[in-house]
From Swiss-Prot:
ATP binds at K15, T174, D175, T216, G217, G218, M219, V220, T221, K222. It is found in: Cytoplasm. It catalyses: L-glutamate + ATP = L-glutamyl 5-phosphate + ADP. Residues 281-359 form the PUA domain. This is Glutamate 5-kinase. GO terms for molecular function: ATP binding; glutamate 5-kinase activity; RNA binding. One of its GO terms (biological process) is proline biosynthetic process. Belongs to the glutamate 5-kinase family. It comes from Geobacter sulfurreducens (strain ATCC 51573 / DSM 12127 / PCA).
Length: 373
């Protein structure tokens, strides 16, 4: 199964974590970066296109600034990113130069992908770089980002880039051998799971916390990334990036690491963008009847099923749809503002025009703009 999946792959997103790229407090691990570059060059020689999502800027910059451990404040982190990003890119240039490959830097924030026009422009830029044989190196723009526009971690970013780039495989290089049934750092008898057909809540609960002192992600965020990628039909391969040949071995047919299979019912790319890239502006609380219809039948959300509205938002905004118990059941783009929904909630669609004096449509959220979670 694995060899059949990997043999069909043409465009790959490879996420490389800080725990792989750095030598603890001693900055970037340039010999290992050279090994990764050699393996990526093999993939390119086989006709595959590669995009790298790379952590490491903050870790590289903190050494230059003499900061021990993780930066203690956001300004410190952003200063470390500012000095470290140029050093990170220079290290990639040095790593790929022996193989004749050029690299390009792309720095993103969530806003860049949430705005549909900028999203499509970023996709066009990626396509153009790849057509010239360039290897894009993508990172979050840590120097200017703040909570409202940050991805949170590069695992999440890598899953979104997989959608952005229309890739057909996500590879996560981490500092352990793959996904285990328990934390291998605290349980030496933990068993590696080579194949995951479905990410369960039990797996998410067992995933634990952050794995290193230099990164912000842990197994929880890696599972979330694999789940997001799987929702639009893309498998994820998790490998130990500290092994200097494991990436090449995986594509040579050796069953290493953990392969996460995509879900049977995948989202189209637009719905994936709605569910995972847009930041919700508010909440719409629905009754049990509407909850059942949305979850089981994939219908549009009508005003008759709405109980109340939380937050302020305009028409076209992304909102959470929640049950009366607070559980989020869907996300979608609204056809009416918070004020308009407040006025028409609980009413039949045929009454909308009489209440508002106009009507955009029968639905609060049309099913084409609604993603059940």
């Amino acid at each position: 199964m694995r060899s059949g999946i990997l043999s069909k792959v043409k465009r790959i997103v490879i996420k490389i974590g800080s725990g792989v790229l750095t030598c603890g407090d001693n900055g970037l691990n340039k010999p290992l970066m050279g090994s990764i570059a050699a393996q990526v060059a093999e993939l390119r020689a086989s006709g595959r296109q590669v995009i790298i999502v790379s952590s490491g800027a903050v870790a590289a910059g903190r050494k230059e600034l003499g900061i021990d451990g993780r930066p203690r404040s956001i300004p410190q982190k952003q200063a470390a990113a500012a000095i470290g990003q140029s050093r990170l890119m220079h290290a990639y240039e040095e790593a790929f130069e022996p193989f004749g490959h050029k690299v390009a830097q792309i720095l993103l924030t969530r806003d860049d992908l949430a705005h549909r026009g900028r999203f499509l422009n970023a996709r066009a830029t990626l396509d153009t770089l790849l057509s010239f044989g360039v290897i894009p190196i993508i990172n979050e723009n840590d120097t200017v980002v703040f909570d409202e526009i940050k991805f949170g971690d590069n695992d999440s970013l890598s899953a979104l880039v997989t959608n952005l780039a229309e890739a057909n495989l996500l590879v996560i290089l981490t500092d352990i051998d793959g996904f285990y049934e328990a934390n291998p750092r605290t349980n030496p008898d933990a068993r590696l799971i080579p194949l995951v057909r479905q990410i369960t809540r039990e797996m998410e609960r067992a995933a634990g916390g952050s794995g290193s002192t230099v990164g912000t992600g842990g197994m929880v965020t890696k599972l979330a990334a694999a789940k997001k990628a799987g929702q639009f039909g893309v498998p994820t391969l998790m490998l130990n990036g500290r092994n200097p040949s494991l990436l090449a071995e995986a594509f040579a047919g050796r069953e290493v690491g953990t392969l996460f299979l995509p879900g049977k019912e995948s989202l189209n790319r637009r719905k994936h963008w709605i569910a995972h890239t847009l930041r919700p502006s508010g909440k719409i609380i629905v009754d049990d009847g509407a909850r059942t219809v949305l979850a089981r039948q994939g219908k549009s959300l009508l005003p008759s099923g709405v109980v109340r509205v939380e937050g302020k938002f305009d028409r076209g905004a992304c909102v959470r749809v929640c049950g009366t118990d607070g559980t989020e059941i869907a996300r979608g783009l609204v056809d009416y503002s918070h004020d308009e929904i407040t006025r028409i909630l609980g009413h039949r669609s045929g009454e909308i025009e009489a209440i508002l004096g106009y009507k955009y449509g029968d639905e609060i959220i049309h099913r084409d703009n609604l993603v059940v979670l």
